[in-house]
Amino acid sequence: MAAPRTYLAIDLKSFYASVECVDRHLDPLTTNLVVADASRTEKTICLAVSPSLKAYKIPGRARLFEAVQRVKEVNAQRLQTAIRQKKAVRGEDGRYHFASTSFDASALNADPALGLSYIVAPPRMQRYLDVSTQIYKTYLKYVSPADIYPYSIDEVFIDVTGYLPYYHMSAHELAMTMVREVLYNTGITATAGIGTNLYLAKLAMDIVAKHIPADKDGVRIAELDEQSYRYLLWNHRPLTDFWMTGPGTVKRLEAHGIYTMGDLARFSIHGEDRLYEIFGVDAEILIDHAWGYEPCGIEQIKSYKPSTNSISEGQVLSTPYPYDKAKLIVREMAEILMFRLTEKKLVTESITLEIGYDRENVDKGGYRGLTQTDRYGRTIPKAAHGTIRFDAPTNLGSTLINESAKLFERITDPALTVRRITLNANKVTPDEGFYQVDFFTDTKKLEREKKLQQAMLGIKNKYGKNAVLKASSYEEGATMRQRNAQIGGHSAGGSAGGSDGKLQK
């Protein structure tokens, strides 16, 4: 039997929002701030919400309009308090309003008559990457890169098994030491989970730590092993709180009377075959997790190589796009895929395109086709999708762009406006430099195109992605220039120093 291991999961608290607060010399734990690109629309997603603003039941990934609406509701209640305390001001129109507002939770708690305000900070993805790298280097002072798995920009797993005897520390002490140094260096608080496997470390951080008191710096550290997991979490609801258990899985479990991990564990004793009928090979993961088991460690994660790979480009458009403008976006996205494949020296066997239509097509009343429900429960036209396979793997722009445009024409309803586009390059493999040719193939032309792509890529890497652009990228509705200035679909922004933000009242 393998020797027991000890893992840490560390999550930086409201990371993007905390960076924005620290760069403004504000306290991340008491400052009301959201990170969102208000220049788009109020439908834009809030990339982060500060802890003090979350306390007003604003979720971390709310749409901006949802945050705005919730603050209005809170202020309506606070204004009544101000009126009762005779601290409100009456305007010329006879209406009451706040004499003062604050975005600091301490001030708001001390004076219930203050109006709640908050800062809307535009995202600065490059700054967040820089701070994340700085924090990663802090972890490296204590452990080897081989024992760290960065799960996301603000979350890591660490195998600390061999380091506990070396430092003469418990897992809790080592976690606190690293978290304290991160706080000292960056001003950012973290939450940590300790577990006998990766799954339990993650749950200790995600679920258990949320229900224990924080220290004076907002730090929470929780621990789980198989036995304490069963005692503490077998009756926990909802199941969606558990790592890797999404709404679709939960819906199927509940259809069979399974509402908790304890229910699932007990069901698996005699109903294992039924679980495999429902979930296929994924049943093994569900059963293991129900009992608190996870055989996979960091070494296995790092050594894993998927049997197939793909590269994806996707975007949600800021406004509904008509057919012709949406087609322009597809061509731009195919060009971006071409450069990504060229840079990685990869080719693709096929492309898949998915077109998501806007809700206005249904709201206007003329649409009579198939529909589906979006994440907000609204009815929208059923998305269109299709795939084109190439005669031979390729990364040539002429093929990718033209075939993507043809696929768009084939699957998209010209009468509907488009809101979401996803383009995938499927089954990507290393470029061996071969072509499938016949008597009509101009191999010299193909070589010239490939060399031109590589030259353009070199210019972009040296002078910026917008150094070389097609004329079509300057047409109305084109998004490539803006997206080239983004990281992960959001503004790269500046580096150190707080960027401009808007104070909302």
Regions found by a protein language model. Name each.
Residues A2, A9, D241, P247-T417:
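DNA-contacting surface of Y-family translesion DNA polymerases
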Residues I153-V156, V347-V362, N424-E432:
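Core structural elements
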Residues T189-T191, T352, R420-T422:
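Residues at or immediately flanking beta-strands
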Residues D363-Y367, G433-V437, R481:
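Short conserved micro-motifs at the rims of enzyme active sites and ligand-binding pockets
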